[in-house]
């Protein structure tokens, strides 16, 4: 297992559209395991492969408090969505920044699990929001893309300043 480097804005690799996984094999399972290690090390609740410079349609999520409810979504497809909600979202690729983002309240998706088995999942609340957030990453979209240009610029400047401070430390 390994902790991978998480890309931060303004890194353009975050805008690359992920490719479908052709076969779930040992390499894909290793990527999934490394992504969980990375997500937990960074204290996140979700991570898309794009965020660790792997441009495959892979997402890992764990919104549980005890960190024991791992959800793997390989090649996820949105089947249905309904309702409206929104919370202040954060993102490991946009450290220490949050903003209110409009999302569907409920979603139904189809995906492959860590073993390559197809399944469908209906989600609501935080899990539904997290799924939508991570699926956005797979198409090169970030939560700040939902914000006004002024708010986007302010967040970019704050993240760049944080990265400069971390580099000096």
From Swiss-Prot:
Note on cofactor: Binds 1 Fe(2+) ion.
Active-site residues, as the UniProt record annotates them: 134
Iron among keywords: yes
Transmembrane segments: none
Lineage, uppermost ranks: Bacteria, Pseudomonadati, Pseudomonadota, Gammaproteobacteria, Enterobacterales
One GO molecular-function entry: metal ion binding
GO terms classed as biological process: co-translational protein modification; translation
EC number(s) recorded for this UniProt protein: 3.5.1.88
Name of this protein: Peptide deformylase
Recorded family membership: Belongs to the polypeptide deformylase family.
Binding site for Fe cation: 91, 133, 137
Species assigned in the record: Enterobacter sp. (strain 638)
Function comment: Removes the formyl group from the N-terminal Met of newly synthesized proteins. Requires at least a dipeptide for an efficient rate of reaction. N-terminal L-methionine is a prerequisite for activity but the enzyme has broad specificity at other positions.
HAMAP family per record: Pep_deformylase
